[in-house]
Structures are given as C-alpha cells and as structure tokens.
Amino acid sequence: MLKKSWQTPTNLLFIMSVAMTFAFATWMALLNNFVIERAYFTGKEIGILQSIREIPGFLAFTAVFLLLVVKEQAFAYISLALLGVGVAISGYFPSAVGLYLTTFLMSVGFHYYETVKQSLSLQWLSIEEAPSVLGKLIAVSSLASLIVYAFLWIAQSYFFFSYETIYLLGGGSCLCLSLIMWLGFPSFKSVTPQRKHLILRKRYWLYYALTFMGGARRQIFTVFAGFLMVEKFGYSVSNIAALFLINHLFNWGFAGKIGHIVGKIGERRALTFEYCGLFLVFTAYAFVDNAVWAGVLYILDHLFFSLAIAIKTYFQKIADPADMASTAGVAFTINHIAAVFIPVSFGLVWLVSPAM
C-alpha cells in the first residue's frame, strides 16, 4: 500500500481513541438506567457486573501471549472490534446473565485495547513528542465523549431512540472505525522488536509502584467521588451530568497543554504536583459541607488525571525499548490489583465514617 500523508501512527492513535470512546462512553452513559429499567438490577447484580468488568483488566498480562500469534496493531483492531460488538449487542440482552456476558466481552476488548495502545504509543512516539501527543489523545477522547453525550441527549429527548438502537449505534461506530483503520492504514513497524514473554524487572520497581497507586487513586475517584456528590451533597442526575460535561470540556481544552507542560518540567515535578494536589483535594473532601465547593473539588480531582501521563512517559525514558509490549500488560494487571480490594474495603470504612 502506498502510504499517504495522513496515514501516520499518530493519526491512527487518534482514530483509535475516538473509536474506543464512541463505544465505551455509550455503554457507561446508559448502564445504570438500562440495568434498572430493563434488567431490574439491585445492588447485588450491579456489584457482580462491575466485578466482572474488572476481571479482564486484572488479566491484561495475558495480552503478551496473544502477541505470539498476532501483531500488536492487528490486535488493537481486534480488541476494538470486540469492544464494539459487546456494546452493540448489550441492548438485546436485558437480563442479569445476558448483561454479565456482554459486559465481559466488552471489557475484554476494552482492556486489551488499552494495553496495546499504551505499548504502541510508547513505541511509535519519540520521547520528545510523547507527553504532548498523549495529552492530545486525552483531549480527543474527551471531545468524542462530548459528542456521544450530546447525541444521547438529542436521541432520547427528541427522537426517543430505544436502548437497543443507541447501543447498536455506539458499538457499531466503533466496529466500523476498526474496519476502516484495518483497510485504510498500513502496518507500522516498531523500531525495536518486542519481547513476547512476561517481564518483571527490579529496576522498574518505581514504575510498578506508581502504576499501583494510580490504580488505587482511580478506584477512589470512580467508585466513591460520584457517590459522595449524591449522598452527602444531594446532587441530582442533572447536576452529576453537568459535572461530567465540565470535566470533559476541561480535558478537551487543557489536556494537550498539560501534556506539553509534563514534557517541559519533567515527570518528577509533574507527579509531585499531582500527588500534593490530590492530598489537598482528598483532605478537603472530608471537611467541605458546601455543595458548590464539593463540585469544584470533584472537577479538580478529575483534572489531575491528565498528569498521570507522566507515569507512562517516565517508563518510556527508563525502559528497554524491547520491553514496551510485555510491560504494558503487566502494568495493567498491577493497576487493577486495587480494583479487587479497594471498593469493598473502603465501602466498609464508608459505613463507619465517610469522612475517613
């Protein structure tokens, strides 16, 4: 295939991010309403479903074994296709077992894609351009999320689309983009051949520790921050939706700039700033009683997520270039260890005292 000017690895990463977001944002936006209205879920069933969703993330290290039989770029397309199919058919299985199965399929695609995307990003991007491009990928994903939310609002408010139709469109768009990428882009070669076995190196210990803490921080935010907004501060559905909208608008506008800043000041300073900021935000959550200030903390909490790209660029600088693929799977597994115990253990702490 004759390579055209737009057929670049960076553009492929952008389209991959859009495809993933079209499917995953649709699934996330519809989940709670669909499982309650159509599948009659209680807390028990939604807890099981969320646990099932995390299993593929915990098993992400197995991606390296699949790379023995399929190239990484093709594996990314296949993973996006699985994500798209899982979302597209979700509306046709309004039962506990049906949703458990479609969720697992969707999650396998999502977590394998995220694993391979990290590996490909660090292989294709130079050390100089990686922070800026990774920030722009977050911005593009946020813009795609805004498009999904706007479409969902119009589709349900004015055209009364069914759940089945919306799931089909969200997952189908991801599947179609996967096919377009497969047909429209050449196979990009990695400068360094990748090792196809599991690797744990002592000199990567700090990267593993940062990855684990990043997973713990993600669980605290995704599981408890929104719950706190509703239970303690009385936020309505529209209030929560407004917070989501503001978060994505900020990411769209500033994530690329944050990536540039990381490249300029370095990973050490960026992560130090993030963790100091998170310490202040988490401490303030325990003492703030005003709903508006709580919303400000929620937005700041989310904004700090963008600085986490410094963990990836730090690894890119210290790692053997041949370790990118194998370490990406190990890192995702480490990141999801926290998902096993934090929701349950911190949930029990919540029952004693939310301020703790």
In which residue ranges do the predicted regions lie?
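Loop-to-transmembrane helix entry/capping segments in MFS-fold secondary transporters
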Residues: G43-K44, I127-L137, V237-S238, P321-A331
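A membrane-interface helix-boundary motif in multi-pass transporters
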Residues: I154-G172, L348-M356
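Intracellular juxtamembrane helix-capping segments at the cytosolic ends
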Residues: Y112-L125, S306-A319
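Structural signature of the two symmetry-related core transmembrane helices
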Residues: F75-A88, R269-A284
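Glycine-rich segments within core transmembrane alpha-helices of 12-TM secondary carriers
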Residues: L134-A150, I334-I342
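Short amphipathic helix-loop junctions that connect adjacent transmembrane helices
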Residues: A29-E45, V223-I240
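Helix-to-loop junctions at the C-terminal end of transmembrane segments
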Residues: A60-E72, Q156, F254-E267, W350-L351
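C-terminal membrane-cytosol helix-exit motif in multi-pass small-molecule transporters
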Residues: L152, G171-S190
